[in-house]
Swiss-Prot record:
It comes from Fusarium langsethiae. Its main location: membrane. Glycans are attached at N139, N220, N515. Induction: Expression correlates with the production of depudecin with high levels on oat grain medium, and minimal levels on oat flower medium and complete medium. Belongs to the paxM FAD-dependent monooxygenase family. This is FAD-dependent monooxygenase DEP2. It is found in: Membrane. The gene is DEP2. It is a single-pass type I membrane protein.
Length: 521
């Protein structure tokens, strides 16, 4: 009899989620194939911001030093009004680092993906120009059929293929075919588009600090600048008119003409007290206009298919949590599979075991956190764009009162509750808050070491066996003796006036007075 092939994961999408998952599976010793419809590390897109929990994951994977070498530290943050005047500022990223333990870093997305790819130990597992056409589940396996006719067989398919996921559509069809109505219209329309954005990078402009974040609020749009010594990342968030807002399956695509039209309306607007947007636009290195979807789906898995990253949750860029949340998904999927396979070292898990593990250990542990992150990001986008009078009051007047330190601490609080790989030991960096999973594990270990160890009985007859159980009633006997002694003492004092051994003269005088009063009454 031939041994069955090892458990294998087919990852669809070689973006942040897919490449992170590939590294996680390498650490777990789980086989995989990574497919992408295009090429790895494409030129579109501008930047990714790695929050402390993203850096912690990279630290576990052994990728952190290589990534940090490609970018510089972030410094302070300033919030500005439509005229570019500062109304609040602080050492934002220093506060985040102090509370969470790791830096926040911004770098070119293409550079980041290239580093993750180059650090993979076996690049032959990565397939470019591999467009998925169909997924077939049969006999406890899955077959991924590509548009060019190639097939890849495995035990689990992970759709990490972005907000317009092909794997998600296939999973929806399979779910509704097996259980009509399982995937509702409400869920399919859960991701909404109410904003678009110009995402671009420019060379440095005199007057803008090399390490800071600048947020300049306007009426229904905002400028977000993340600055590095050699370039500046710029995102212009714009609220769409009601008649242009949409949900799935509508996909807004913008042309160069669309982007130029928007730029013409904002080119003279201040981004700082000394720089207007046109100066950044003139120095642009690359730019594109995109839709900003936001939302969280309810079903993350069905059968032997699971969704991750933007395919299942999408957050606006203001909070810089989207890519980090996708990395969290990769970690939890890998943890789930590592634990599941450890239960069956000599055989593969069944369909039911795979399905239940992915639902209970992955989906059910992730969905609430994803919703909280998406809401936080959406609220911040609207607040910074003065989207309504409440948002204006919060950003312009309450933020200076509350202080950016509070926002930085909240970001750090989200970071330290993120997961890490359960099977990779490393010397993590800690901030004031500490990593919650690590603290919980330490507390559990301490509680185990404090458990009283039962006293081993000596061989032969012991006092407890010899006395016939007499020791079990010793406490009751002692209480009875103490009560009897007190009664005798009280009787003795009342009627004789003598002292009770161990008590001072004040007690004797008290009982003498009591005696005389009682006897002559």
């Amino acid at each position: 009899m031939h041994d069955s092939p090892p458990f294998k994961v087919i990852i669809v999408g070689a973006g942040v989620t897919g490449l992170t998952l590939a590294h996680c599976l390498v650490k777990a010793g789980i086989d995989y194939a990574l497919l992408d419809k295009g090429v790895v590390a494409p030129g579109f897109g501008t930047t990714i911001t790695l929050q402390p929990h993203g850096c912690r994951i990279l630290h576990q994977l052994g990728c952190l030093d290589a990534v940090l070498a490609k970018c510089d530290v972030m410094g302070g943050a300033s919030c500005r009004d439509p005229n570019g005047k500062i109304f609040t500022s602080n050492d934002f990223f220093g506060v985040v680092r102090k509370f969470a333990g790791y830096d926040t870093r911004t770098l070119d997305r293409q550079v980041f993906l290239h580093e993750l790819y180059e650090l993979l130990p076996d690049k032959s597992k990565v397939y470019e120009k591999a467009r998925v056409e169909e997924i077939i589940e049969e006999n406890s396996t899955t077959r991924v059929i590509l548009a060019d006719g190639r097939e890849f067989a495995g035990d689990l398919v992970v759709g990490a293929d972005g907000v317009h996921s092909k794997v998600r559509e296939i999973m929806w069809d399979k779910a509704n075919a097996a259980h009509p109505g399982m995937i509702t219209v409400e869920e399919k329309r859960a991701m909404v588009t109410q904003y678009n954005a110009i995402v671009m990078a420019s060379s440095p402009v005199p007057g803008i600090s090399a390490h800071d974040m600048e947020v300049t609020s306007n009426d229904n749009y905002s400028f977000l600048l993340l600055c590095q010594p050699d370039w500046i990342s710029i995102i212009v968030h714009s609220k769409l008119p009601d008649d242009q807002q949409c949900t799935w399956p509508t996909r807004r695509r913008y042309t160069e003409t669309d982007m130029e039209e928007l730029v013409s309306k904002i080119i003279e607007r201040p981004v700082t007290g000394s720089v207007v947007f046109g100066e950044l636009w003139k120095r642009r290195l690359k730019a594109q206009m995109i839709s900003l979807e936001e939302g969280v789906l309810s079903h993350w898995t069905f059968g032997r298919i699971a969704l991750a990253g933007d395919a299942v949750h999408k957050v606006t860029p203001n909070s810089a949590l989207g890519g980090n949340t996708a990395m969290e998904d990769a970690v939890v999927i890998a943890n789930t599979l590592h634990a599941l396979l450890a239960m069956h070292p000599n055989k593969k898990p069944s369909d039911v075991e795979v399905r239940d593990a992915m639902r209970e250990k992955y989906q059910n542990t992730r969905v609430d956190r994803a919703r909280a992150i998406v809401k936080a990001g959406g609220d911040l986008t609207r607040q910074q764009a003065y989207d309504g009078w409440k948002a204006y009051i919060k950003q312009r007047w309450l933020t200076p009162i509350i202080g950016l330190d509070t926002l930085a601490q909240k970001i750090a609080g989200l970071c330290v509750t993120a997961p890490k790989l359960a099977y990779v030991d490393f010397d993590e960096r800690r901030g004031i808050l500490g990593w919650q999973d690590t603290l919980a594990a330490e507390k559990e270990r301490e509680s185990k070491t404090q458990v009283k160890v039962p006293i081993k009985q000596k061989k032969g007859l012991s006092w407890s066996t010899w006395n016939g159980g007499f020791e079990a009633i010793v406490p009751q006997i002692l209480v009875l003796w103490a009560g009897l002694w007190l009664a005798i003492c009280f009787f003795h004092l009342v009627f004789s006036g003598n002292h009770v051994p161990g008590f001072g003269s004040e007690v004797a005088r008290f009982f003498t007075v009591y005696n005389e009063t009682w006897m002559h009454s």
